[in-house]
Curated annotation (Swiss-Prot):
Record PANTHER family: CATION-TRANSPORTING ATPASE-RELATED (PTHR45630), ENDOPLASMIC RETICULUM TRANSMEMBRANE HELIX TRANSLOCASE (PTHR45630:SF7)
Protein's UniProt name: Endoplasmic reticulum transmembrane helix translocase spfA
Region (N-domain): 515-721
EC number from the UniProt entry: 7.4.2.-
Gene that this polypeptide is encoded by: spfA
Pfam families referenced in this protein's UniProt entry, alphabetically: 2TM_P5A-ATPase, E1-E2_ATPase
Length: 1303
C-alpha cells in the first residue's frame, strides 16, 4: 500500500496515482455512443417520432438537452481535477503500473494538475519522477514518497563544513552525465502560450461558459441586440485578461539570466562553460561578468570574498560583503540560515567586486594562495564557490515561481460565494416553479415553458462576480504601484482589509537607517571622580578626539565595510556613520587610516589592516576582527606592528567574554538604552603586542578563542532617529481599530523607549525577562524599566490579571521560550505590546500564535532578517530603503527604455516597407547621433546637460565623440540613410522632417498606452522581495496604512458587489416569472439601455478610489450577517410591493387581457412602459443606495463616472415618467400617460427609492458589526486623549486659517 502522503512537500496538499482510459471510455464519450444512435433511431422512424418526440420543438429540446449534457460532462473535466480523473482515468494499484499522478497544491499556490510520470533506468536503477510547476519531484523508495529534488544542503543533519572546503568539483564524465540527467540544465524555461491557447483555457472557465449559455438562451428568446452586446463585452474582457497574462509571462521569461561564459573546475581542470550548463557540485569561479549579469545559480563561497548587490532578490540596494567558509572549522556543520548565511551568493545577485585574503602562506605571497582541497586557482583570479542549487530551485527561481503560480487568477471566497448562490437559488426555484405551474395550467407550449424556467434559474447566478472581483483587485494593485508598493500575491489584498494586529520590526522599519553616533560611554568605569548618576551609571560621553587608542582601534577594525574598486565604501550604514565620526578612512585591501593628525597617548597609529573577519550573526549577537596595527612612538618615531582583536556586540553578550567586568557596567548601558539609544559594547585584546602574526597563524584561530579573555573598551552609543512618518503611521493604525505591536531583536529598554515615542505603549511598562543575576537559566521575573519593581513569574501558571489590566507588557525572547507550549502563552500574546531580543525564528512563532488565536495579522520588516515572520503573516510587507529620488530615476529610465523600444519597432517597420526611418522623438534624441533624422538633438543634449548640472553645450559637433550612441539595426539604418542623398531622397527627407511632429505624437501616444496606469503593474525582479508578498520600494512607514486602505477598499467593493448582484438577481427572477406571465415585455432597445447602465455602474464601482485616512469603523468581514442579508431581503420586498401595486393600478385603468400572447412581438403598452420605468429606477436605487463610500472609499459624488451615470439614468427615468421630453418617450417606445398616471408613477418611483434608503440605513445602524476584535479594542482613557488631541488639532488649524486670512 502507498502511504497517505504520496508527495512530501509543504506546498502540496494531496496526490494520487492513475492510469489513463482510452478516449472511447471517457465518461463524456461512452454513454453518448449509446444515446445518440438511440435518439437518431427514434428521430428517423416516423412511428417512434410521433410516439416519443411529438413535434419539432421537442426535437429541439431533446437534441439541445443531449448536447448540453455531453458538453457539460466534458467541461466538468476542465473545471475540476477530481472529476477529470474520475471521468478519464482509473486509480493505479502501484507505482510501477501508474502512468499519471494527480497533484493538488495548497490554497493560493497555483492550480492542480495531472502530470505524466517518467520512469528512468539510468545507471541500472529505476527512478520515478514528475514535473509540477517547474519543479522535478523524485520518488525516494526509503521514504516511500515523492519529494522535490534534494540537494546537499537539504540533508538533515546538515553536512560538515569540510565537505565543501575539500570539494574537488565533478571529476568524471559518468558523474557529470548522471547529475545532468538528475537535475537538468540551469535555466528558467518559462514557455509563453499563444494568445489562442490561453484564450481556450479562459473560454472553458465555468463563469464564461455559463455566460455564453445565458447569451444563447436570450437569443432563443429573441433578445438579439442585448445578447450580442453581452457576448461582445465578455469576449473583450476575457481577451484583455488573456493579453495581460501573456504580457506578464513574457516579462517573467525576460527574468531568465542569459547564459554567459564561466570558469568551471571539471574533470581535474579549469574549463570555460556557459552558465546554463552548471550543475550542483560544480566548482566555479565567481567574478564580475563582462555582461554585468546576475549570478547564474546559488553558490557557497569556499575561497575569497565578494561584494554583491542583492537588489534583484531582496529589493535591498545596499551592497553586502560575502565571505567564504575557508577558515571555518571543518567539523562544524554548515549553517545556511545562521553563521554561514554570509557565505552564500544567491542566483540573481550581481557581483560588484572580488577580493582574496592571503590564506595559507606564512610569507603572504600570492603564489601560496590555494584551496585546502589542492584545487588550483581559476584562470580569471575569481573567488571559488561550490554550486549548491540551480534552475528553479535557486532563490531567484523560487521567487519567479511564486510570482507565476500565486498570481494565476484571483478568486472569490469560494465557500461564501457558493452559499450565497445557493441562498439566491431558493428564490429562483420558487419563481421557476410558479412559471411552470401557471404555464401547465394554461396549457402553454412546453418547450417555451422549459426555456423560461431555465432562464429564471440561470438569472440567479451572477456571472459578473469573478470579473468584478478581478477588477477590484487590479484597481488596488494599480493604486498601490503609484505608492511604489508591489504585490506578488494579489489574493492577499482583501486580507489587508481585515487586519487586526500590525507587527513592526524596529530597526530600519520604525527607526531610520541613518544612525547618529552620540559618543563613547563607560570609559570612566572603575575610575575615581567620574560623573555618576543616581543609580551608579556613568553618563559621560566621550567625543571622537578624546577616545583612547584601544577603543579607537576596536571601532576602526570591528566592521564589515569594504571599499569598491570605483572608490565607494559599501556596507552597514551604522558602521559607515561610526567610521565617519571617528575620522578614519577605509582604503584598498581592508586598510584604514586616521584623518586626524594625532591621537591621545604616547603612540600614534599609522594604519590598521584587517586580516580576518568573524561576521555579525543575529544568533551570536556579536562580530569580531583580527587586524595588524602599525603604531609609531611619538618621540623616537619607531614603528611597531601588533596583532589586535576588536570585538563589538550586545552588552549582555560581551559581558560574558570579559576578563573583568567593570563596576556599574550594567547600570551604564541601561541608562542609555532607557533613553532610546542603541548601545554596543566594545572589547579587545592583543594576540601579540610587539610583532605581527603571520596569516597562517591568524587563520588557525577559531572564533571561540578570539572572543574570550577580552578587555572592556567602552560602549558605543548611537541614536536611531524615528522615520519622519512613523508616529503619524502608528497613530493612524491605533485610531483605526488596529493593535500595533513591536517585534525586535534589540534591547528591551531601547525597544520600550521607541515604542513609547511612536505611541505603541502609553502606560507603565513591565518587562518579562530573566533576572540580571540569574545564571541558572530557569527563573523569570516581571521588572519595571527603572528596576524598582521585581516579581518572580511561574510560566506554568496563569498571568496576574492585575498586571494585564494596569500595565503594558514587554517580553524578551528568553521569556517567550519559557512560555511557549504553556497554557498562558496565548494570553501573553494577546496582551504583549513589545517583543525584544527575539530571534528570527521566534518572530515567526509570534505570528503563528496570533494567527492560531484567530487574528488577521500584518508584519512589516526589512526583508532580510524577518523572512519567516513576513511569510507567516496574512499580510507581509518588506520595507526597502529607496528614496523618492531613486524612484524618479528608475521611472525615467523605464520611460526612456520603452520609448527606445517603440522607436526601434517603428524604424524596422519603415524598413520593411522601404520607407525612410521616422525622426527620432525628442525624449530619446540624446541617445542617437546628430543628423537630419534627429532634428531634436541639440535641444535634447542641452536638456541632458542641465539635468546633470553641467554647463549648456556650446555646440553639438564638439561633443559627438562623447555621446553614448546605440548600435541597434534601427540606429545603424538611421546613420546610413543620412549619407549620399540624391535630390529625390532629399525631398523625401524634407517630407519626413515635416512628419516629425506627427511621429512624435504617435510615439508619445503609443508610450502612454504602454504606461497606462490603470493597469495592474507587471512585477519585475527588483520590485519584489523574496521575503514578502508586499514590497514597498520606499522606506516610508505610511506604506502600511496605504496597503490597509486598499485592502478595506477591495473588501468593501466585494461585499457591495454581492449585495447589488443579489438584488439584481432577485428582481430579475421576479421579472421573468410573475411579470412575464402577465404578458409584460421590454423592447430590445430598452433592455440594452439598462444593460449598458449596469455595465458602466459596475465598472465605476470597482474603480472607486480609497480615501486618504483610515476610519475607526471597520468593513463587514463577510456577507452572512443580519445587516447584509436583512438589507437585501428588505429592499427586495419594497421593490416587489411597488411592482405589485403598479401592475394592479394599471389593471384598474386597463383591464387585464384574458388571452395573453406570450410568444407575440413586443408591443408598447401602459403596463410595459410603467413597469420598465419602475424597474429602471429600482436598478438605479440598487446601485446608489448599496454603494459603500466613505469612510472607506470616495463617496458616490466623488466617483464622478458613477455619479453622473446614475444622475443621467435617473434623469431619463423621471423625464420619461413625467413625459418631460415626449420625443425621448417615442424613441424608447413608451406609450403616452395621463396626468394622474404620471403623478402616481412618479410618486411610486420616489417611494420605492426612499423605502430602500430607509431600510438600508436603519439596518446598517442597528445591525452592522463595525467593532474591532478584542485585541484591538482601545481603553476609555485612550479614546478620551484621542478626542482631546483632535480638538486641539482643529483649534490649531482654525487659528492658522484665521492668521492667514488676516495676512
Amino acid at each position: 500500500m502507498l502511504r497517505a502522503k504520496l508527495v512530501d512537500d509543504p506546498q502540496i496538499k494531496y496526490a494520487s496515482l492513475h492510469n489513463p482510459l482510452p478516449t472511447q471510455l471517457h465518461a463524456y464519450v461512452w454513454p453518448f455512443l449509446i444515446i445518440w444512435p438511440a435518439f437518431f433511431a427514434v428521430y428517423l422512424s416516423p412511428e417512434r417520432y410521433d410516439t416519443y418526440i411529438q413535434g419539432q420543438e421537442w426535437t429541439f429540446v431533446w437534441s439541445g438537452s443531449i448536447i448540453t449534457a455531453q458538453s457539460l460532462l466534458w467541461l466538468m473535466t476542465k473545471w475540476n481535477i477530481n472529476i477529470q480523473t474520475l471521468f478519464t482515468a482509473t486509480k493505479a494499484r502501484s507505482l510501477d503500473s501508474a502512468q499519471l499522478i494527480k497533484v493538488i497544491p495548497v490554497a493560493n499556490a497555483g492550480s492542480a494538475e495531472i502530470c505524466p510520470l517518467h520512469c528512468d533506468t539510468m545507471g541500472g536503477k529505476k527512478t520515478f519522477s514528475f514535473l509540477f510547476q517547474k519543479r522535478r519531484f523524485l520518488y525516494y523508495p526509503e521514504r516511500q514518497c515523492f519529494a522535490p529534488l534534494s540537494y546537499v544542503l537539504d540533508a538533515e543533519p546538515k553536512p560538515p563544513v569540510k565537505v565543501f572546503q575539500q570539494a574537488q568539483g565533478l571529476t568524471s564524465k559518468e558523474e557529470i552525465d548522471r547529475i545532468q540527467h538528475h537535475y537538468g540544465d540551469n535555466t528558467f524555461d518559462i514557455p509563453v502560450p499563444t494568445f489562442m491557447e490561453l484564450f481556450k483555457e479562459h473560454a472553458v472557465a465555468p463563469f464564461f461558459v455559463f455566460q455564453v449559455f445565458c447569451v444563447g438562451l436570450w437569443m432563443l428568446d429573441e433578445y438579439w441586440y442585448y445578447s450580442l452586446f453581452t457576448l461582445f463585452m465578455l469576449v473583450v474582457f476575457e481577451s484583455t485578461v488573456v493579453w495581460q497574462r501573456q504580457r506578464t509571462l513574457n516579462e517573467f521569461r525576460g527574468m531568465n539570466i542569459k547564459p554567459y561564459d564561466v570558469w568551471v573546475y571539471r574533470q581535474k581542470k579549469w574549463q570555460e562553460l556557459t552558465s546554463d550548463k552548471l550543475l550542483p557540485g560544480d566548482l566555479m569561479s565567481v567574478n564580475r561578468t563582462k555582461e554585468d549579469s546576475g549570478v547564474a545559480c546559488d553558490i557557497l563561497l569556499i575561497e575569497g570574498s565578494a561584494i554583491v548587490n542583492e537588489a534583484m532578490l531582496s529589493g535591498e540596494s545596499t551592497p553586502l560583503l560575502k565571505e567564504s567558509i575557508q577558515l571555518r572549522p571543518g567539523d562544524d556543520l554548515i549553517d545556511p540560515d545562521g553563521l554561514d548565511k554570509n557565505a552564500f551568493v544567491h542566483g540573481g545577485t550581481k557581483v560588484l567586486q572580488i577580493t582574496h585574503h592571503n590564506s595559507n602562506g606564512e610569507d603572504g605571497s600570492e603564489k601560496a594562495r590555494k584551496l585546502s582541497s589542492g584545487v588550483p586557482l581559476p584562470p580569471d583570479n575569481g573567488a571559488v564557490g561550490v554550486v549548491v542549487k540551480t534552475g528553479f530551485e535557486t532563490s531567484q527561481g523560487s521567487l519567479v515561481r511564486t510570482m507565476i503560480y500565486s498570481t494565476e487568477r484571483v478568486s472569490a471566497n469560494n465557500v461564501e460565494a457558493l452559499l450565497f448562490i445557493l441562498f439566491l437559488l431558493i428564490f429562483a426555484i420558487a419563481a421557476a416553479w410558479y412559471v411552470w405551474q401557471e404555464g401547465v395550467a394554461k396549457d402553454r407550449k412546453r418547450s417555451k415553458l422549459l426555456l423560461d424556467c431555465v432562464l429564471i434559474v440561470t438569472s440567479v447566478v451572477p456571472p459578473e462576480l469573478p470579473m468584478e472581483l478581478s477588477l477590484a483587485v487590479n484597481t488596488s494593485l494599480a493604486a498601490l504601484s503609484k505608492f511604489a508598493i508591489f504585490c506578488t500575491e494579489p489574493f492577499r489584498i482583501p486580507f489587508a482589509g481585515r487586519v487586526d494586529v500590525a507587527c513592526f520590526d524596529k530597526t530600519g522599519t520604525l527607526t531610520g537607517e541613518d544612525l547618529v553616533v552620540d559618543g563613547i560611554a563607560g570609559l570612566t568605569l572603575g575610575h575615581e571622580g567620574a560623573d555618576v548618576g543616581k543609580d551608579g551609571a556613568h553618563t559621560e560621553l566621550a567625543k571622537s578626539a578624546n577616545v583612547p587608542l584601544d577603543t579607537t582601534l576596536v571601532l576602526a577594525s570591528a566592521h564589515a565595510l569594504v571599499k569598491l574598486d570605483e572608490g565607494e565604501v559599501v556596507g552597514d550604514p551604522m558602521e559607515k556613520a561610526t567610521l565617519q565620526w571617528l575620522g578614519w578612512t577605509l582604503g584598498r585591501n581592508d586598510t584604514l587610516m586616521s584623518k586626524a593628525a594625532a591621537l591621545a597617548g604616547p603612540r600614534t597609529v599609522e594604519s590598521v589592516q584587517i586580516k580576518r573577519r568573524f561576521q555579525f550573526s543575529s544568533a551570536l549577537k556579536r562580530q569580531s576582527t583580527i587586524a595588524t596595527v602599525v603604531t609609531a612612538d611619538r618621540k623616537t618615531s619607531k614603528k611597531t606592528k601588533a596583532t589586535f582583536v576588536g570585538v563589538k556586540g550586545a552588552p549582555e553578550t560581551i559581558r560574558t567574554m570579559l576578563v573583568n567586568t567593570p563596576p556599574h557596567y550594567e547600570e551604564t548601558f541601561k541608562y542609555f538604552t532607557r533613553n532610546g539609544a542603541r548601545v554596543l559594547a566594545l572589547a579587545y585584546k592583543y594576540l601579540s603586542e610587539e610583532s605581527e602574526l603571520s596569516q597562517g597563524r591568524i587563520n588557525g584561530y577559531i572564533r571561540e578563542e578570539i572572543e574570550a579573555d577580552l578587555i572592556f573598551a567602552g560602549f558605543l552609543v548611537l541614536q536611531c532617529p524615528l522615520k519622519e512618518d512613523a508616529i503619524k503611521a502608528v497613530r493612524m493604525l491605533n485610531e483605526s481599530s488596529h493593535r500595533v505591536v513591536m517585534i525586535t531583536g534589540d534591547n528591551p529598554l531601547t525597544a520600550v523607549h521607541v515604542a513609547r515615542k511612536v505611541e505603541i505603549v502609553d502606560r507603565d511598562v513591565l518587562i518579562l525577562d530573566a533576572p540580571e543575576d540569574d545564571m541558572s537559566g530557569t527563573r523569570l521575573v516581571w521588572r519595571s524599566i527603572d528596576d524598582k519593581f521585581n516579581r518572580d513569574v511561574d510560566p506554568t501558571q496563569d498571568l496576574d490579571p492585575e498586571i494585564i489590566e494596569t500595565k503594558d507588557i514587554c517580553i524578551t525572547g528568553y521569556a517567550l521560550a519559557k512560555f511557549k507550549g504553556q497554557k498562558a502563552f496565548s494570553t501573553l500574546l494577546r496582551h504583549t505590546w513589545v517583543y525584544a531580543r527575539v530571534s528570527p525564528k521566534q518572530k515567526e512563532d509570534i505570528l503563528v500564535g496570533l494567527k492560531d488565536a484567530g487574528y488577521t495579522t500584518l508584519m512589516c520588516g526589512d526583508g532580510t532578517n524577518d523572512v519567516g515572520a513576513l511569510k507567516q503573516a496574512h499580510v507581509g510587507v518588506a520595507l526597502l530603503n529607496g528614496s523618492p529620488e531613486d524612484l524618479a530615476k528608475i521611472a525615467e529610465h523605464y520611460r526612456t527604455t520603452k520609448m527606445k523600444e517603440i522607436y526601434e519597432k517603428q524604424v524596422s517597420m519603415m524598413q520593411r516597407f522601404n520607407q525612410p526611418p521616422p525622426p527620432v522623438p525628442v525624449q530619446i534624441a540624446h541617445l542617437y547621433p546628430p543628423g537630419p533624422r534627429n532634428p531634436h538633438y541639440q535641444k535634447a543634449m542641452e536638456r541632458e546637460a542641465q539635468r546633470k548640472g553641467a554647463a549648456t553645450l556650446a555646440t553639438a559637433g564638439n561633443q559627438t565623440e562623447h555621446i553614448p550612441t546605440i548600435t541597434s539595426p534601427g540606429a545603424q539604418a538611421l546613420q546610413q540613410s543620412n549619407a549620399n542623398l540624391t535630390p529625390q531622397q532629399q525631398r523625401q527627407q524634407q517630407a519626413s522632417i515635416a512628419a516629425a511632429g506627427f511621429a512624435d505624437k504617435l510615439t508619445s501616444s503609443m508610450l502612454e498606452q504602454e504606461l497606462d496606469d490603470s493597469e495592474p503593474p507587471t512585477i519585475k525582479l527588483g520590485d519584489a522581495s523574496v521575503a514578502a508578498p508586499f514590497t514597498s520600494k520606499l522606506a516610508n512607514v505610511i506604506a502600511i496604512p496605504n496597503i490597509l486602505r486598499q485592502g478595506r477598499c477591495t473588501l468593501v467593493a466585494t461585499i457591495q458587489m454581492y449585495k447589488i448582484l443579489a438584488l439584481n438577481c432577485l428582481i430579475s427572477a421576479y421579472s421573468l416569472s410573475v411579470i412575464y406571465l402577465d404578458g409584460i415585455k421590454f423592447g430590445d432597445g430598452q433592455v440594452t439601455i439598462s444593460g449598458m447602465l449596469m455595465s458602466v455602474c459596475f465598472l465605476s464601482i470597482s474603480r472607486a478610489k480609497s480615501v486618504e485616512g483610515l476610519s475607526k469603523e471597520r468593513p463587514q468581514p463577510n456577507i452572512f450577517n443580519v445587516y447584509i442579508i436583512g438589507s437585501v431581503l428588505g429592499q427586495f420586498a419594497i421593490h416587489i410591493a411597488t411592482l405589485i401595486y403598479l401592475s394592479n393600478y394599471v389593471y384598474s385603468i386597463e383591464p387585464r387581457k384574458s388571452d395573453i400572447d406570450l410568444e407575440g412581438e413586443f408591443e408598447p403598452s401602459l403596463l410595459n412602459s410603467a413597469i420598465y420605468l419602475l424597474q429602471l429606477i429600482q436598478q438605479i436605487s440598487t446601485f446608489s443606495i448599496n454603494y459603500q463610500g466613505r469612510p472607506f472609499r470616495e463617496s458616490i459624488r466623488e466617483n464622478k463616472a458613477m455619479y453622473w451615470g446614475l444622475v443621467a439614468a435617473s434623469g431619463v427615468a423621471f423625464s420619461c415618467a413625467t413625459e418631460f421630453i415626449p420625443e425621448l418617450n417615442e424613441k424608447m417606445r413608451l406609450v403616452p400617460f395621463s396626468t394622474e398616471f404620471k403623478v402616481t408613477l412618479t410618486v411610486l418611483m420616489i417611494i420605492d427609492y426612499a423605502g430602500c434608503w430607509i431600510i438600508e440605513n436603519v439596518l446598517k445602524n442597528l445591525f452592522s458589526d463595525f467593532r474591532p476584535k478584542d485585541i484591538a479594542v482601545r481603553r476609555p482613557d485612550q479614546l478620551q486623549r484621542e478626542m482631546e488631541r483632535k480638538k486641539q488639532e482643529e483649534l490649531e488649524t482654525q487659528a492658522e486659517k484665521e492668521r492667514q486670512r488676516k495676512v
